Amino acid sequence: MADKIDISLYEKARIVVYGDIMLDRYWYGQASRISPEAPIPVVNVDQIEARPGGAANVALNVVALGASVELMGVVGDDQESRELETLLNKKSINCHFHRLNDHPTVTKLRVLGQNQQLLRLDFEKTLKHYEDKGLLQRYQHSLSHAQAVILSDYAKGALFNVTALIQRAREKGLPVLVDPKSVDFSRYAGATLLTPNLKEFEAVVGHCRTDQELESKARALIHQYRFEAILITRGKQGMMLIQKEGAAINLVAHAREVYDVTGAGDTVIAVMAASLAAGGDFYEAAQLANLAAGLVVRKLGAATVTVPELRRALHQITASHHGILSEKALLLAVADARAHGETIVMTNGCFDILHAGHVHYLEAAKAMGHRLIVAVNDDNSVRRLKGKDRPINSLQARMEVLTALRAIDWVVPFSEDTPARLITEVLPNILVKGGDYQPSQIAGGDEVVKNGGKVLTIPIKEGFSTSRLVEKMLN
């Protein structure tokens, strides 16, 4: 598995964004009456705003995460492009525009009444072809110090040469992420990851009645066009991640309130790129992108998400699970805790019948660091270790009791006889067991020490034993 994502590393990432650059205008006002001229609302405009859109909004999302970005694409030689460049420069985005005299900057004007979108006017002309060797040379130069490339395709023509852009980046060993609008996915052959929404995906493969059909058709595209993965965004249904190998992964949507989905796809691909650049794998990146999407749709217009917002959301999710986490969720929480400089302590056991000796031991373990992880043998694992009459309490019951203890931050189940594999994934700063073990006997201890961690033991509180308690109960 790839190194766990430390989102503080976003600020070290350098990302190239190439695509259809737009200017988004917003006219806000009150719509309190119907026009006498036609059955349409009259909006009394009291606020006007301009924001970067399309590929420019992707670049804004990347910068909001703390990463550096170079933005490239085609605009008109007009007031809109100059206004756009001013907005982007204020956000420290390096712009490399190819200006065309006979081509307008794509502009979208949205009219809103009481913050509800009533009308959108598009000012655009699709670009068939353009020649600019200077822009291509600039792109080639930028690849030498980039960690990822985003190609933002809104089907306006800036990516007519997308095959060459993908090829040059892949030759440099860079991941290429594409937000596709074209129904011809062969154009993106060789890209690392595609992030279509469900409508865009079904426009290519046809309607999918089940998740299995969705996965099957995505996997066929992956093999046909040499993609490494496809991430399908599905609105309220969340996301589906399909990779070359392994089963598809469904991620449940996090948004409770949706104000505006404008630009949500831009946020998703920006977080995916930053996460891959920070050393994450597709699943870890998709978890964060899914979380970010849930945050951005609560905002009005094409908005962005920041690292502090992601951190807060991560902590809220951890708290909402009452300490019981899957292995994947645990690794994400640990990475975030490490980014805060926290010391991770880990222990494990069956914890079939919790007693005062356990409480004493766990409180002593927590005192060694900031976060305490308790890995718990699942029922089959306990049965193999303790016999057919154990456990007395089910895995879920044992984990719920453990989470009630103030000393414990996260509880995670494991199915093997020992948690050695899980410990190797987490690599805590301190691995702890009871005093009846020698450090050399502790599963996973060697890997922890190799990583610079410590393996420690805590004296057992005399007079307490789960096995003796069980014997008393049975007799």
Swiss-Prot record:
Task: Give the organism the record lists.
Answer: Coxiella burnetii (strain Dugway 5J108-111)
Protein name in the entry: Bifunctional protein HldE
Q: Where is this region: Cytidylyltransferase?
A: 346-475
Keyword annotations? ATP-binding, Carbohydrate metabolism, Kinase, Multifunctional enzyme, Nucleotide-binding, Nucleotidyltransferase, Transferase
InterPro entries from the entry? Bifunc_HldE (IPR023030), Carboh/pur_kinase_PfkB_CS (IPR002173), Cyt_trans-like (IPR004821), PfkB_dom (IPR011611), RfaE_dom_I (IPR011913), RfaE_dom_II (IPR011914), Ribokinase-like (IPR029056), Rossmann-like_a/b/a_fold (IPR014729)
Q: What is its EC number?
A: 2.7.1.167, 2.7.7.70
Q: Which GO terms describe its biological process?
A: ADP-L-glycero-beta-D-manno-heptose biosynthetic process
Q: Active site located where? A: D266
Provide the function of this protein.
Catalyzes the ADP transfer from ATP to D-glycero-beta-D-manno-heptose 1-phosphate, yielding ADP-D-glycero-beta-D-manno-heptose.
Under CDD domains, the record lists: RfaE_like
Pathway of this protein?
A: Nucleotide-sugar biosynthesis; ADP-L-glycero-beta-D-manno-heptose biosynthesis; ADP-L-glycero-beta-D-manno-heptose from D-glycero-beta-D-manno-heptose 7-phosphate: step 1/4; Nucleotide-sugar biosynthesis; ADP-L-glycero-beta-D-manno-heptose biosynthesis; ADP-L-glycero-beta-D-manno-heptose from D-glycero-beta-D-manno-heptose 7-phosphate: step 3/4
Q: What HAMAP family does the entry give?
A: HldE
Catalyses:
D-glycero-beta-D-manno-heptose 7-phosphate + ATP = D-glycero-beta-D-manno-heptose 1,7-bisphosphate + ADP + H(+); D-glycero-beta-D-manno-heptose 1-phosphate + ATP + H(+) = ADP-D-glycero-beta-D-manno-heptose + diphosphate
Q: Which EC class heads this enzyme's classification?
A: transferase
Taxonomy, top ranks, is: Bacteria, Pseudomonadati, Pseudomonadota, Gammaproteobacteria, Legionellales
Q: Which residues does ATP bind?
A: N197, L198, K199, E200
Complex formation: Homodimer.
Q: Which GO terms describe its molecular function?
A: ATP binding; heptose 7-phosphate kinase activity; heptose-1-phosphate adenylyltransferase activity; phosphotransferase activity, alcohol group as acceptor
Q: Which protein family is it in?
A: In the N-terminal section; belongs to the carbohydrate kinase PfkB family. In the C-terminal section; belongs to the cytidylyltransferase family.
